[in-house]
Amino acid sequence: MIVALGADLVEIARVERLLSRHGERALRRLFHEEEVAYALARQNPFPSLAARLAAKEAFQKCWPESLSWKEVWVGMEGKRPALRFAPRIEARMAEEGLFAHLSLSHERSHALAVVVLEARARGGG
């Protein structure tokens, strides 16, 4: 059963400006090491970083309490992006039988993330 839906759209140039202005400090504050490594392996890291920022915001719209930037991040499962969580969020997701589906997309100027939070039977899916 779908419990929540979150979507967010981020302007790629805004992320580029933010990082050019605040550099390494902003990268460390906003993104998990796994996200930074993935993005920096690309010729242009900004669309990937913008999509990951959108994913964090989209998940926050599904979650009932505030989160820090690094409590949720995007990792890869093969070629598919997947949300990863800090231990306290992971534990609560498991306790409540929740699973987060993630879809990312980006075009020339914007990155989009959609998160669907699904309640599953405890133990599977």
UniProtKB/Swiss-Prot annotation:
Gene3D superfamilies annotated for this entry?
4'-phosphopantetheinyl transferase domain
> What Enzyme Commission number(s) appear in the record?
2.7.8.7
Record keywords, A-Z:
Cytoplasm, Fatty acid biosynthesis, Fatty acid metabolism, Lipid biosynthesis, Lipid metabolism, Magnesium, Metal-binding, Transferase
Enumerate the catalysed reactions: apo-[ACP] + CoA = holo-[ACP] + adenosine 3',5'-bisphosphate + H(+)
Q: Which GO terms describe its biological process?
A: fatty acid biosynthetic process
**Cofactor(s) recorded in Swiss-Prot or TrEMBL:** Mg(2+)
Q: Name one GO molecular function term.
A: holo-[acyl-carrier-protein] synthase activity
Q: Which residues form a coiled coil?
A: none
Name the source's superkingdom: Bacteria
Which cellular component appears as one GO term in the record? Answer: cytoplasm
Q: What SUPFAM superfamilies does the record tag this protein with?
A: 4'-phosphopantetheinyl transferase
Q: Which residues bind Mg(2+)?
A: D8, E57
Location of this chain's protein in the cell: Cytoplasm
Q: What does this protein do?
A: Transfers the 4'-phosphopantetheine moiety from coenzyme A to a Ser of acyl-carrier-protein.
What the record says about family reads: Belongs to the P-Pant transferase superfamily. AcpS family.
What protein name applies here?
Holo-[acyl-carrier-protein] synthase
High-level lineage:
Bacteria, Thermotogati, Deinococcota, Deinococci, Thermales
